[in-house]
Amino acid sequence: NYQREYSWEENEIQDFLNDLEDTCANPSTIHFFGQIVVHNDEDSQTKFIIDGQQRTITSMIFVHSLQLLYENLYFTTQYHPASKKEVLLSNYVGEYSDEEKSLHLILSEADNPYFIQTITARQPSDSKETKKSWERIRKAFKTIYEYLDSHCQDASDTSKKMDCLNRYFEAFFERFKVMYIEATKLEEAFIIFETLNA
């Protein structure tokens, strides 16, 4: 099984946030976020990430954090543009409830239960996890959420806070670029992965 546990530590998360901040600060900047190599298993109609798992998981944690901040802004102010952005972001993440189990990213067996708990949480947990990869997911969510929240907290009114969140949204969705490669044969996906990482 090539689905690995989540391994990004604080320094990788900080690098991600620094890259995001640099991209926000320079509107003409494009940030190359690495490569994603995928095996598209046509039999199971499932796509398996061979290379780029860590950045994909971190991206989903970022998107969920942003989604919650838009949602919180809407609930506290009834500012409708925030609600529209929250709905848009929920399309990226998917849904997970008793009625709807359609998350768009499923992690390794070891991490998926905690990831579901994280991606459906209303806020990051302060309770330390005993499993190392779960603790890394918890810390990533807490760090990213608190970073975005604190950077947009100073915004003096609703529209300024919305502008702040939108800056991060646009930097990530419009100017973070990945090289995406998909293969229908598993062997081909691994050859591509090995060639790119040689």
Residue ranges and their predicted role:
Residues 1-198:
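Glycine- and hydrophobic-rich flexible loops that cap the catalytic core of alpha/beta enzyme folds
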